[in-house]
Amino acid sequence: MRVCVTGFNVDAVRAVAIEETVSQVTGVHAVHAYPRTASVVIWYSPELGDTAAVLSAITKAQHVPAELVPARAPHSAGVRGVGVVRKITGGIRRMLSRPPGVDKPLKASRCGGRPRGPVRGSASWPGEQNRRERRTWLPRVWLALPLGLLALGSSMFFGAYPWAGWLAFAATLPVQFVAGWPILRGAVQQARALTSNMDTLIALGTLTAFVYSTYQLFAGGPLFFDTSALIIAFVVLGRHLEARATGKASEAISKLLELGAKEATLLVDGQELLVPVDQVQVGDLVRVRPGEKIPVDGEVTDGRAAVDESMLTGESVPVEKTAGDRVAGATVNLDGLLTVRATAVGADTALAQIVRLVEQAQGDKAPVQRLADRVSAVFVPAVIGVAVATFAGWTLIAANPVAGMTAAVAVLIIACPCALGLATPTAIMVGTGRGAELGILVKGGEVLEASKKIDTVVFDKTGTLTRARMRVTDVIAGQRRQPDQVLRLAAAVESGSEHPIGAAIVAAAHERGLAIPAANAFTAVAGHGVRAQVNGGPVVVGRRKLVDEQHLVLPDHLAAAAVEQEERGRTAVFVGQDGQVVGVLAVADTVKDDAADVVGRLHAMGLQVAMITGDNARTAAAIAKQVGIEKVLAEVLPQDKVAEVRRLQDQGRVVAMVGDGVNDAPALVQADLGIAIGTGTDVAIEASDITLMSGRLDGVVRAIELSRQTLRTIYQNLGWAFGYNTAAIPLAALGALNPVVAGAAMGFSSVSVVTNSLRLRRFGRDGRTA
């Protein structure tokens, strides 16, 4: 079940309180609160859990005192993958909203789906919540601005008349307690929890001005109703503009949700039945016509079509799909009729995983924000102390309590840490959202900082720098042997292997029309080769190390042929029988077109580039020379890749590992920054820090550039927010800033931070990075 909550979108403490409170409800298995996206995901058993109890627990958690909340980060900040989603046993998506003036949550509404499993629900979420947020503030803007100007005008133009003060009071009263009610309520809730936030400062400042002016209305002193009214007017205007801007920042998830198909054509006993997509189950057959979106992840069982996978990979070139090929939900069938057997539905589809990953990243914090959090924890009490000291100083030293009160109110208003609270989450939200549009899935704040520090990029060779489409180029036979005989023996042994080289050997035998003899007793030697029994005798197929381990006799002319092939960048595969090598196969892989360009761009960024491979040194060196890589780690077994990455780290290098996310998974985890390329599988998403849905290598450069640009934006935002408060508070304390000007400046600072973050939406457009 997913619940959308308002009121804690910048409060990690509330998120932890919600997780702790909801986890105690019967039937709840796990709770993840995402403070940055104002959502809570609950995994529970429908037969045991009570939805009303869950919603009640969330409401209760809003008022848990801060000192009773465990000092930890929300669970959502530590999520490394999406495997837990598979534990969902049922549920529906709910939307919970607490509009101003309503103490109890609205009745949760069904957003689609069946109790049997998780569903995406309405594609308008979270955009719906943002529209609700804007509806909250816009009427208050229309109320506060005219009345605030009326209060100002009554003081400026009719101050000499006795009724002017009462007119200002009448105009300010609804502004203070109607337009400003969400702010006052927020301050009261914080006070109940013995905490404080930006609402506390605004409420204290405006109430001080309002109460003081009300007293002076009877006592005959100066009035500041216009100050209170205009401050609230500018604050609610700022909140409205902020909601509009952050709505643009959070569009990524809404756009992703809108990509999915809403209906599917289900094949039941040969008949077509149009059903909602959430009714399709694993194993069902669905028919997809030209122009339709493929509704679920699956495997093509019949038909041929070009499929637009740009939503998944970021590449605009259609991909040809035939029987046996896998397809992803939300991709578009362009020109053929396909029958697809569903292999993943609902929360298990690639699109759902992408949505969760983006949501996780947007709910995450960058380590740089820890400083901001520590400062914010003491910021509000410190500002209140400065305001009190300001009033006392003006009263005792300057003997001007009226100026002291004005300066104190200005201090409270100008110091509102809105910009500080928005600095990091808005940048992460926009940056990760733009990355998702480009097929770059970033796992949040920790990844951003790692991207800044890396100085070495290590590429796996097969499937990363190369296409992983091996083919046999040459067959060199020993004395008294024919090339076809050697190829038949090798194909027999490799017929039980799933290795790309083995598949290439078997394919070559089929292409030549050779009859492949039966083989048994297969034994794979990890990273070296394969042994099997063919025609009653042992046959060995593998690399030079396997030849040495098996003590096979290697004729000189075959050894020389192997060296020649390796120097040409090909892999030499030895075939052994009856204690000696009887032939050598040359297997080649083609380098990706953009490999050399990408390596050059990484060098231009000041990064060292290395290649890691199980190939022998000569073959590896030939490939490395072709793409411009200077450092080669050759003859590395799959299980030793982690050790090689660790060795580089021990040398003081900060390493990014780029691999296919399957056999490279341990090395991806070991690296300071793991980048899985060309795959959207669970393994890739779980193991890597960045997943590139496209197989194009330039995604590596774009991922690093986007991460670094996002981090720079965070630093810019924090610098502006800290600098703004550092400069403005002394000016306000000295009386150089009118409280009304302070309120406008406070709103401007928040909008400026969000606007700066929105610049990231231009990343990658027309060759620009931001």
From Swiss-Prot:
Stated membrane topology is: Multi-pass membrane protein
A GO MF annotation of the entry reads:
P-type monovalent copper transporter activity
Active site, per annotation: D460
Task: List keywords of the entry alphabetically.
Answer: ATP-binding, Cell membrane, Copper, Copper transport, Ion transport, Magnesium, Membrane, Metal-binding, Nucleotide-binding, Translocase, Transmembrane, Transmembrane helix, Transport
Per UniProt, where does Mg(2+) bind? D660, D664
Keyword check for Cell membrane = yes
Name the Enzyme Commission number(s) assigned to this protein.
7.2.2.8
InterPro entries according to UniProt: ATPase_P-typ_cyto_dom_N, ATPase_P-typ_P_site, ATPase_P-typ_TM_dom_sf, ATPase_P-typ_transduc_dom_A_sf, HAD-like_sf, HAD_sf, HMA_dom, P-typ_ATPase_IB
What is catalyzed by this enzyme? Cu(+)(in) + ATP + H2O = Cu(+)(out) + ADP + phosphate + H(+)
Q: Taking every annotated instance into account, which residue ranges of this chain make up the domain HMA?
A: 1-66
| Consequence of gene disruption | Mutants show increased copper sensitivity.
Query: What is the induction comment?
Result: Induced by copper ions via CsoR.
Stretch list, region Disordered: 103-130
Q: Where's it found, cell-wise?
A: Cell membrane
Q: SUPFAM superfamilies given for it?
A: Calcium ATPase, transduction domain A (SSF81653), Calcium ATPase, transmembrane domain M (SSF81665), HAD-like (SSF56784)
Q: Provide the transmembrane region boundaries.
A: 141-161, 164-184, 193-213, 217-237, 377-397, 402-422, 718-737, 741-760
**For bias kind Low complexity, which ranges apply?**
110-121
Looking at the UniProt record for this protein, which Gene Ontology cellular component terms does it annotate, in alphabetical order?
Answer: membrane; peptidoglycan-based cell wall; plasma membrane
Q: Name one GO biological process term.
A: response to copper ion
Q: What does this protein do?
A: Necessary for copper homeostasis and likely functions as a copper exporter. Also required for full virulence.
Family affiliation: Belongs to the cation transport ATPase (P-type) (TC 3.A.3) family. Type IB subfamily.
PANTHER family, per database record: ATP7, ISOFORM B (PTHR43520), P-TYPE CU(+) TRANSPORTER (PTHR43520:SF8)
Q: What is this protein called?
A: Probable copper-exporting P-type ATPase V
The record lists the organism as Mycobacterium tuberculosis (strain ATCC 25618 / H37Rv)
Gene encoding this polypeptide?
ctpV
